[in-house]
Amino acid sequence: MSQPSKHAFTAGEPPRERIAIYPGTFDPVTMGHLDIARRALHLCDRLVIAVGDNRNKKPLFTLQERLELIRRSLAELDLNSRIQVASYRGLTVKFAEQIGATLIIRGLRAVTDFEWEFQLALINRQQNPNIETVCLMTSQEYSFLSANMVRELAMLGGKLDEVVTPVVAEALRAKFVKGGQTADVRDI
Protein backbone atom coordinates (compact mmCIF):
# COMPACT_ATOMS: atom_id res chain seq x y z
CA MET A 1 0.00 0.00 0.00
CA SER A 2 1.43 3.37 -0.93
CA GLN A 3 2.01 6.08 1.63
CA PRO A 4 -0.08 9.25 1.36
CA SER A 5 1.67 12.34 0.11
CA LYS A 6 3.07 14.56 2.85
CA HIS A 7 1.12 17.33 1.12
CA ALA A 8 -2.19 15.46 1.06
CA PHE A 9 -5.30 16.98 2.57
CA THR A 10 -6.29 15.36 5.85
CA ALA A 11 -9.84 15.66 7.19
CA GLY A 12 -10.05 18.26 9.93
CA GLU A 13 -6.99 20.18 8.75
CA PRO A 14 -7.21 23.34 6.69
CA PRO A 15 -5.84 22.82 3.18
CA ARG A 16 -2.21 23.84 2.78
CA GLU A 17 -1.20 26.61 0.44
CA ARG A 18 -0.54 25.04 -2.96
CA ILE A 19 2.80 26.31 -4.21
CA ALA A 20 4.08 25.75 -7.74
CA ILE A 21 7.39 26.63 -9.32
CA TYR A 22 7.95 27.59 -12.93
CA PRO A 23 11.67 26.99 -13.54
CA GLY A 24 13.76 28.21 -16.43
CA THR A 25 16.66 30.34 -17.55
CA PHE A 26 14.41 33.17 -18.80
CA ASP A 27 17.17 34.75 -20.90
CA PRO A 28 15.15 36.84 -21.53
CA VAL A 29 11.64 36.37 -20.20
CA THR A 30 9.19 36.36 -23.12
CA MET A 31 5.47 36.92 -23.52
CA GLY A 32 5.20 33.14 -23.88
CA HIS A 33 6.79 32.63 -20.45
CA LEU A 34 4.50 35.23 -18.91
CA ASP A 35 1.45 33.62 -20.53
CA ILE A 36 2.35 30.25 -18.98
CA ALA A 37 2.86 31.93 -15.58
CA ARG A 38 -0.52 33.67 -15.79
CA ARG A 39 -2.29 30.44 -16.70
CA ALA A 40 -0.44 28.46 -14.01
CA LEU A 41 -2.10 30.65 -11.39
CA HIS A 42 -5.28 28.60 -11.98
CA LEU A 43 -3.43 25.57 -10.58
CA CYS A 44 -1.89 27.00 -7.44
CA ASP A 45 -2.23 29.57 -4.69
CA ARG A 46 1.27 30.93 -5.22
CA LEU A 47 3.66 30.62 -8.15
CA VAL A 48 7.41 31.04 -7.85
CA ILE A 49 9.20 31.81 -11.09
CA ALA A 50 12.46 30.00 -10.38
CA VAL A 51 15.36 31.42 -12.36
CA GLY A 52 18.09 28.84 -12.74
CA ASP A 53 21.70 29.84 -12.18
CA ASN A 54 23.38 27.26 -14.39
CA ARG A 55 27.14 27.74 -14.53
CA ASN A 56 27.31 25.70 -17.75
CA LYS A 57 25.25 28.27 -19.66
CA LYS A 58 26.48 31.63 -20.88
CA PRO A 59 23.39 33.84 -20.62
CA LEU A 60 23.04 37.20 -22.31
CA PHE A 61 21.68 38.74 -19.10
CA THR A 62 23.19 38.24 -15.66
CA LEU A 63 21.17 36.43 -13.03
CA GLN A 64 20.33 39.72 -11.31
CA GLU A 65 19.28 41.30 -14.61
CA ARG A 66 17.00 38.35 -15.40
CA LEU A 67 15.38 38.50 -11.95
CA GLU A 68 14.79 42.24 -12.30
CA LEU A 69 13.43 41.95 -15.85
CA ILE A 70 10.93 39.33 -14.71
CA ARG A 71 9.84 41.40 -11.71
CA ARG A 72 9.42 44.52 -13.82
CA SER A 73 7.58 42.58 -16.57
CA LEU A 74 5.18 41.11 -14.00
CA ALA A 75 4.50 44.62 -12.68
CA GLU A 76 3.93 45.97 -16.22
CA LEU A 77 1.33 43.26 -16.81
CA ASP A 78 -0.15 43.52 -13.29
CA LEU A 79 0.68 39.85 -12.63
CA ASN A 80 2.72 40.17 -9.46
CA SER A 81 0.08 39.67 -6.74
CA ARG A 82 0.52 35.86 -6.41
CA ILE A 83 3.80 35.43 -8.26
CA GLN A 84 7.22 35.60 -6.66
CA VAL A 85 10.59 35.50 -8.38
CA ALA A 86 13.58 33.64 -6.94
CA SER A 87 16.86 32.19 -8.14
CA TYR A 88 18.25 28.76 -7.45
CA ARG A 89 21.23 26.59 -8.27
CA GLY A 90 21.18 22.82 -8.49
CA LEU A 91 18.33 20.38 -8.96
CA THR A 92 14.96 21.96 -9.65
CA VAL A 93 13.16 19.31 -7.61
CA LYS A 94 15.37 20.06 -4.58
CA PHE A 95 14.52 23.76 -4.85
CA ALA A 96 10.83 22.82 -5.04
CA GLU A 97 11.24 20.77 -1.84
CA GLN A 98 12.98 23.64 -0.05
CA ILE A 99 10.11 26.05 -0.65
CA GLY A 100 7.31 23.53 -0.12
CA ALA A 101 6.19 23.41 -3.75
CA THR A 102 4.14 20.42 -4.89
CA LEU A 103 3.99 21.32 -8.59
CA ILE A 104 6.59 22.04 -11.25
CA ILE A 105 5.10 23.96 -14.18
CA ARG A 106 6.54 23.53 -17.66
CA GLY A 107 5.49 24.97 -21.00
CA LEU A 108 5.29 22.92 -24.20
CA ARG A 109 5.51 24.71 -27.54
CA ALA A 110 5.54 21.71 -29.84
CA VAL A 111 5.76 17.94 -29.82
CA THR A 112 9.55 18.30 -30.05
CA ASP A 113 9.55 19.72 -26.48
CA PHE A 114 7.60 16.76 -25.13
CA GLU A 115 10.34 14.10 -25.06
CA TRP A 116 12.75 16.27 -23.07
CA GLU A 117 10.04 17.44 -20.66
CA PHE A 118 8.82 13.86 -20.21
CA GLN A 119 12.34 12.72 -19.26
CA LEU A 120 12.71 15.62 -16.81
CA ALA A 121 9.34 14.84 -15.22
CA LEU A 122 10.32 11.19 -14.71
CA ILE A 123 13.68 12.11 -13.17
CA ASN A 124 11.99 14.61 -10.87
CA ARG A 125 9.38 12.02 -9.85
CA GLN A 126 12.17 9.55 -9.11
CA GLN A 127 13.83 12.17 -6.90
CA ASN A 128 10.59 13.10 -5.10
CA PRO A 129 7.30 11.34 -5.93
CA ASN A 130 5.34 14.01 -4.00
CA ILE A 131 6.15 16.71 -6.55
CA GLU A 132 4.19 16.56 -9.80
CA THR A 133 5.17 18.08 -13.12
CA VAL A 134 2.37 19.81 -15.01
CA CYS A 135 2.91 20.75 -18.65
CA LEU A 136 0.85 23.58 -20.09
CA MET A 137 0.48 23.90 -23.83
CA THR A 138 1.70 27.22 -25.10
CA SER A 139 -0.99 29.57 -26.33
CA GLN A 140 -1.19 29.54 -30.12
CA GLU A 141 0.09 33.10 -30.53
CA TYR A 142 3.34 32.15 -28.74
CA SER A 143 3.85 28.64 -30.14
CA PHE A 144 6.77 29.79 -32.31
CA LEU A 145 8.45 31.83 -29.59
CA SER A 146 11.67 30.99 -27.73
CA ALA A 147 14.19 33.06 -25.81
CA ASN A 148 16.79 32.14 -28.46
CA MET A 149 14.54 33.51 -31.18
CA VAL A 150 13.94 36.71 -29.21
CA ARG A 151 17.68 37.26 -28.76
CA GLU A 152 18.21 36.78 -32.49
CA LEU A 153 15.37 39.16 -33.35
CA ALA A 154 16.89 41.77 -31.05
CA MET A 155 20.37 41.26 -32.45
CA LEU A 156 19.08 41.74 -36.00
CA GLY A 157 16.99 44.79 -35.12
CA GLY A 158 13.62 43.03 -35.44
CA LYS A 159 10.30 44.07 -33.91
CA LEU A 160 10.05 43.04 -30.26
CA ASP A 161 6.78 44.62 -29.12
CA GLU A 162 4.68 41.44 -29.47
CA VAL A 163 7.21 38.99 -28.06
CA VAL A 164 8.51 40.72 -24.90
CA THR A 165 7.39 43.45 -22.52
CA PRO A 166 8.63 47.02 -23.11
CA VAL A 167 11.17 46.76 -20.27
CA VAL A 168 12.69 43.61 -21.81
CA ALA A 169 12.71 45.15 -25.30
CA GLU A 170 14.60 48.16 -23.93
CA ALA A 171 17.13 45.91 -22.15
CA LEU A 172 17.67 43.84 -25.30
CA ARG A 173 18.23 46.92 -27.43
CA ALA A 174 20.76 48.19 -24.89
CA LYS A 175 22.66 44.88 -25.09
CA PHE A 176 22.72 44.69 -28.88
CA VAL A 177 23.05 48.26 -30.10
CA LYS A 178 26.67 49.37 -30.11
CA GLY A 179 27.44 52.86 -31.34
CA GLY A 180 24.20 52.97 -33.34
CA GLN A 181 24.85 49.65 -35.08
CA THR A 182 23.45 46.22 -34.37
CA ALA A 183 25.91 43.83 -32.75
CA ASP A 184 27.71 41.25 -34.87
CA VAL A 185 26.43 37.68 -34.52
CA ARG A 186 29.88 36.67 -33.23
CA ASP A 187 29.34 38.95 -30.21
CA ILE A 188 26.68 36.62 -28.79
Q: How would you name each of these model-derived features?
A:
Residues 2-188:
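Nucleotidyltransferase catalytic core that binds NTPs
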